Curated annotation (Swiss-Prot):
InterPro entries: GAF-like_dom_sf (IPR029016), HrcA (IPR002571), HrcA_C (IPR021153), WH-like_DNA-bd_sf (IPR036388), WH_DNA-bd_sf (IPR036390), WHTH_transcript_rep_HrcA_IDD (IPR023120). One of its GO terms (biological process) is negative regulation of DNA-templated transcription. Negative regulator of class I heat shock genes (grpE-dnaK-dnaJ and groELS operons). Prevents heat-shock induction of these operons. This is Heat-inducible transcription repressor HrcA. One of its GO terms (molecular function) is DNA binding. Belongs to the HrcA family. Keywords: Repressor, Stress response, Transcription, Transcription regulation. PANTHER family: HEAT-INDUCIBLE TRANSCRIPTION REPRESSOR HRCA. Signal peptide: none annotated. It comes from the Bacteria. HAMAP family: HrcA (MF_00081). It holds the Pfam family HrcA.
Length: 351
């Protein structure tokens, strides 16, 4: 059913009040706090209509109304005013990105911390599945006599290393030679393309350095296994306990239990936002997972070039300060791209 301007203004006033107070909103409150030019009785009648239309609900213990998921959805899509970040909040996000960082996962963790502090909700972030990650470089670096460090770098900026044991007779120049061979054969391949024929080609090229083939190969394999594990970051879950929606011990326990399931969080982020460059808002029952039916999730992807590198999201109660979260996500997204491209380069073809 169509909402006329009067109903829209009343619905916006109720939701704005409820977001800030967490208390059911009555007609007298709306009449007193908002200059709508309407009597309390008129507002009461309009609120009854909005409830009948599914935009508001009435808790059993209160004469006031609270927004339904449908009400929040209409608010977010059509009524919500834009917010601006404070200079302090902008500085917080910029500082998180400007810290000396040489790996994408470090950047993501720093940004997650900043977003959680600014929004006062929980932030979640994930790097994508790595089967299609392209190997950018392999280095074998001498550490001490009898030990070397295998370092694998992917096109998405992920860096993993593995300490290996080697013969004490192996010279540094041998390790440079081995690094060159591994780079020649592996650079530009996806993780899924590294197979036995490729390994045999490396073996044929090793020549006098055959004795360190297996240790280095084991080190590369170990790095790939580390890369292949999805990386998920969660910050500020404890923030949720500050909201009355989570004052119930059982409700809080269910939510915190959900937040430690990293595989589940990774799936939530992947399912919530598969479209590049879009910001997606899921409200209450729009979420598939039962423990999130009373939460809202706002997610976006971040990219380098035209490649989606990962997803970041904010989760809070449905009584979320949506405009504030969207302002933070929009600013973060605008700055994230340049920092991601600095870390991993604009050419993500792996060639």
């Amino acid at each position: 059913m169509f909402l006329d301007e009067r109903k829209k203004r009343i619905l916006q006033s109720i939701i704005d009040d409820y977001i800030s107070t967490a208390e059911p909103v009555g007609s007298r409150t709306v009449a007193r706090k908002h200059e709508l030019g309407l009597s309390s009785a008129t507002i009461r009648n309009e609120m009854a209509d909005l409830e009948e239309m599914g935009y508001l609900t009435q808790p059993h213990t209160s004469a006031g109304r609270i927004p339904s998921d449908k009400g929040y959805r209409f608010y977010v899509d059509q009524l919500m005013k834009q917010s601006e970040l404070t200079m302090e909040e902008i500085y917080s996000i910029k500082s998180a990105m400007d810290t000396k960082i040489n790996e994408l996962s470090q950047l993501l963790k720093q940004v997650s911390v900043a977003m959680s502090k600014i929004t006062k909700y929980a932030s979640m972030a994930a790097l994508p599945e790595k089967k299609n990650s392209v190997l950018k470089a392999v280095q074998v670096v001498p550490v001490e006599k009898g030990k070397a460090l295998v370092v694998v770098i992917t096109n998405s900026g992920t860096i993993k290393n593995s300490l290996i044991n080697i013969s004490e007779t192996v010279l540094p120049e041998h390790l440079v030679y081995v690094s060159n061979i591994f780079n020649e054969k592996l650079s530009g391949l996806t993780i899924g393309q590294i197979n036995m024929p490729v390994i045999r080609e490396i073996e044929l090229l090793m020549g006098p350095s055959q004795d360190i083939l297996m240790p280095v190969l084991n080190g590369v394999t170990d790095c790939i296994e580390q890369i292949d594990k999805s990386e998920v970051f969660l910050e500020g879950a404890i923030n949720m306990l500050n909201y009355p929606e989570f004052s119930n011990v059982e409700r809080a326990r269910e939510f915190l239990k959900l937040m430690v399931e990293k595989d589940l969080i990774s799936r939530v982020l992947k399912d919530a936002n598969s479209e590049k460059d879009k910001i997606v808002i899921k409200i209450g029952h729009e979420n598939d997972i039962e423990e999130m039916k009373e939460c809202s999730l706002i997610t976006t992807t971040y990219t380098a070039g035209d490649v989606v590198i990962g997803t970041i999201g904010i989760i809070g109660p449905t009584r979320m300060e949506y405009s504030k979260v969207l302002a933070a996500i929009n600013y973060m997204k605008s700055k994230m791209k340049e920092h991601v491209e600095r870390l991993i380069g604009k050419d993500l073809s792996g060639k």
